Amino acid sequence: NVVSEPVVSLLRDFSAPVQLNYDYQDEDLAFLLKYENNGFNRWQVTQMLVNRILLQGQDAKSSPEIYLQAVAQALPELAASDAMLAARLLDIPLAPELASAIHKDYDPELVKAQREGLYQQLAEALKDQWSELYKQLPMQAYEDSAAARGTRALRNVVLDMALTANVAGADEWAQQQYDNASCMTERFGALKVMVNHQLANADA
């Protein structure tokens, strides 16, 4: 009674550092991004899809839309159940990571522009989610637990995304987070986005 072809999640719970080449379609990667319940595999397929979008040549076949829609669908539930994984799924690989996958004709300015462009698209595609997500991650007394570390990590990412998308009031969130921080992670996260986005109070 299987009505559609199954999508294979490979090397689940496999601890050895293995690189396996498998011909995933973009739709397969997006499906696993949304529904995979193995955290590492979910992160890995997300990185595979992002790298495919960023590193494709002029004959571009991978559309950012399938990635953006998958993240938008997966993020609310994941933010509530595993904040650290949610934060990591919003990561866009840094330019040096992307460079390691390019074996010829490396153009650092082009790679940088493509990365920043996808980050901007992601921030704007989920613009309506950032305010609610930030409210769901309230600042509390410092706690050194996996859940608390995940909350802090996701809050910093959401704050940067909100500022990137010009969400109303996000500059005030940054100032409040800086003023009320209970640890260096919160304070530095707020200061970093204030400087990167050239907020008026960044030098205060």
Residues covered by each model-derived region:
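Long, ordered, helix-rich scaffold segments
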Residues: 2-204
